[in-house]
Design a protein with these regions (language model features):
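Transmembrane beta-barrel strands of outer-membrane/channel proteins
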Residues: 68-74, 103-105, 124-128, 171-177, ...
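Solvent-exposed loop/turn segments connecting transmembrane beta-strands
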Residues: 77-84, 101-104, 116, 148-151, ...
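Outer-envelope beta-barrel architecture signal
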Residues: 62-68, 86-88, 97-99, 116-122, ...
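Outer-membrane beta-barrel transmembrane domain signature
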Residues: 98, 160-162, 177-260, 264, ...
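N-terminal signal peptide c-region/cleavage motif recognized by signal peptidases
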Residues: 54-59
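Extracytoplasmic loops and strand-loop junctions of Gram-negative outer membrane beta-barrel proteins
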Residues: 72-75, 106, 137-141, 172-174, ...
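Outer-membrane beta-barrel "beta-signal"
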Residues: 89-93, 191, 283-296
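Short glycine/proline- and aromatic-enriched beta-strand/turn motifs that initiate or cap beta-hairpins
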Residues: 60-108, 215
């Protein structure tokens, strides 16, 4: 399940006070002109504002804090559909010594992982792979397109967590092979960066690219000759390659030390010849999700 959420940011931990002190206790200007002093003070204020905007700790994609709660997601019936739906989704993340489960990196997945070096983890996962319901799309119903049932995938991943100054960064590479051999395999590359922290409010941005082999694209967007005869749509055979790219915003608001409201906004665009499939009504789709989670 696609659900990128934000977790709790850390306490103030002196960034604000330290920077402010740096401004208010600036060295005397001595014999320098007022203009130079003004420029220097302005530069210090600008730096202070920039540093104050940076997060002190990681968001849900950028930390390992445990989360559990319900959420709602507004999504297309499938990528490329003009129909939108609302569904209930989990907000979950837990990391044990080796075992983990989470919904905060684009899919609902569980598995094991090990630390290869500080901040670098390798692992294996089982993930939920959503299907495609004709009942959710007027276009699919009108053309008698068969449903694709939800399923599962197995794969490997490599994740790097790092900080540049106070900025948390997570880079995730993941390969997913569907348990149903006819649905092929996909690979994800996802980058998440924390960009804002002010009081109880935190925010981050992310970008993702997903590639798919020919089996995967054909199962999702292909039209076989026999299907063409039934649906009235032209036969279409997509190849493998970049499936979609997306960018998004992550946010969270701490209600208290134990409860947090989380959410995300994502714009996703189909790529390659998949975007030319007769099943694609529009190349770009939006996702909106929000939920409430308990820190445990």
């Amino acid at each position: 399940m696609k659900f990128a959420v934000m977790g709790r940011m850390g306490a103030e931990e002196a960034i604000g006070p330290t920077v402010v002190a740096g401004i208010s206790n600036a060295d005397p200007c001595g014999g320098r002109s007022r203009r130079k002093s003004s420029r220097r003070a302005g530069g210090r204020i600008a730096c202070a504002i920039c540093w104050a905007m940076l997060p002190l700790a990681a968001s849900a994609e950028l930390s390992n804090d445990s989360l559990l709660g319900p959420g709602l997601r507004y999504r297309p019936a499938y990528d490329g559909s003009s129909s939108q739906r609302v569904e209930l989704v989990p907000v979950i993340r837990y990391f044990g010594e080796t075992w983990f489960i989470r919904s905060t990196q684009g899919v609902l997945e569980t598995g094991v992982r090990t630390e290869l070096a500080p901040g670098l983890h390798a692992g294996a996962q089982l993930a939920y792979e959503p299907g495609r319901k004709s009942s959710e799309s007027a276009f699919l119903r009108s053309h008698q397109i068969a449903e694709i049932p939800g399923g599962a995938s197995a794969g490997l991943q490599l994740e790097w967590d790092h900080t540049v100054g106070p900025v948390p960064i997570t880079l995730l590479a993941r390969v997913r092979k569907n348990i149903d051999s006819e649905r092929g395999a996909q690979a994800d590359l996802r980058l998440s960066v924390g960009v804002f922290h002010g009081g109880p409010v935190s925010a981050g941005i992310f970008g993702q690219a997903t590639w798919a082999d020919e089996k995967s694209t054909t199962s999702l967007y292909g039209i076989a000759p026999q299907q063409s005869a039934v649906t009235g749509l032209p036969a279409f055979q997509p190849g493998g390659g970049l499936l979609f790219s997306s960018v998004g915003l992550l946010w969270s608001v701490d209600l208290n030390p134990k409860w947090v409201v989380v959410g995300s906004l994502e714009s996703r665009r189909l790529s390659g010849n998949v975007a030319d499939s007769p099943l694609v009504e529009r190349r770009s789709n939006g996702y909106l999700s929000a939920g409430i989670a308990y820190h445990y």
